Amino acid sequence: MAVTWLRLEARRRWRSLVVVALLVALTVGTVLTAVAGARRGESAFDRLWAVTLPATITVVPNQPGFDWSAIESLPEVSATTLFVVQDGELITGTGPDGSFSSDNLGFPPGGPGALHTVERPVVLAGRMSVDSRADEVVASAEFMSEHHLRVGAPLTIHLPSPAQAEQSFDPTSAQPKGPLAQVRIVGVVRSPFWLDGPGSGGGVLPTYAFTQKYSQYLFGSDLARTSVYVNALMRLNGGEAAIPAFKADLARVTHRSDIDVWDNYQKFGGPVKKATSYEAAVLLAFGLAALLAALFLVGQTVSRYVADSAEDLRVLQALGLTRRKAVVCAGIVLGLAAVAGAVIGVAAALTASRWMPIGLAAYAEPHPGFSADWLVLAVGGAVAVLLVAGGTALLT
């Protein structure tokens, strides 16, 4: 009987069934995109943190010639990478829109292992640079987007002269007088410390071989007079919990209490997580509003469909059709329409995941592009079908 009823309804009222399927598809696609996008955005920084060997702390004595050997050997320290703090270079290149210049050269590595043992970034495109190659750099996604570049693009780094480097040369106020270093972008990367932000312009990270090759143009030729200094990123045994013990040992071995130690998760992750939590709440609110509106629209459509079918079902009941079978007949037709709509909606949500997450979370997402949150998609699709089928049963 149910199969016969399905054939009759599909032939007579296919337009109404298509409307139900489309409404369900629109509802499922919109709500699941919002919910999955909210979950993905809120977890973006933590997922980036989990896969990049992030530095627990940044140690910033800001002192030229600082001796790191005693600090690196402290029992709390698991791994260290040093970075040079200076900003005397100018980067030029050519993109689709013509020539461009930028002063966003990231902190050059001050020792081996940078981008490998600490703050090992996820590679969004291309590959990681090779430490021994002075002509290779990696760039942030924002830098690539800002200048419309692709992996393999050549850049020229205008270095200051040794005398300029010693005096913290500003490339925006005068022309660098050092050599021109020809480099090529081999990859696009992202990590918590090297995180982009809105309007930041992104940056380029050279290798340790670059630092070694052009050392006198970064530090100057007289290290006793230079104003350039090296700070450190460190991973601690025990993570954040080990920071107080590290600070105590740092003060003991340096005989200084004025050295800043940043808790990287709080300093870099705190503002990002605050923003992404707000963005997730907005997306969830949008999804809830869409759901409430859809419940009204779908409910009205299902109610009209059931009312139109009631007369035919009453005739069949007079001929011996039980109430239970009548409910099954009505439910199976709308249930199949809901299944079709749910499948389309889930497919739409999967497609929309390419543009998620949005806002600040997009800058922290370790795996941008297509992403399937199967928990949300499966549960959401199933609930949509059950609501339509259950509503039909109650109204019949």
Regions found by a protein language model. Name each.
Residues 334-347:
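Hydrophobic alpha-helical membrane-insertion segments
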Residues 313, 395-396:
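N-terminal low-complexity Pro/Gly-rich stretches
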Residues 1-295, 299-308, 323-324, 329, ...:
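Membrane transport/envelope proteins' first extracytoplasmic loop
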Residues 311-323:
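Helix-loop-helix units of permease transmembrane domains in multi-pass membrane transporters
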Residues 152, 320, 345:
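Conserved G/P- and acidic residue-centered "switch" motifs that form tight phosphate/ATP-binding loops
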Residues 344-354, 395:
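C-terminal TM-helix exit segments that contain a strictly Trp-centered aromatic cap at the helix terminus
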Residues 377-395:
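Hydrophobic alpha-helical transmembrane segments of polytopic membrane proteins
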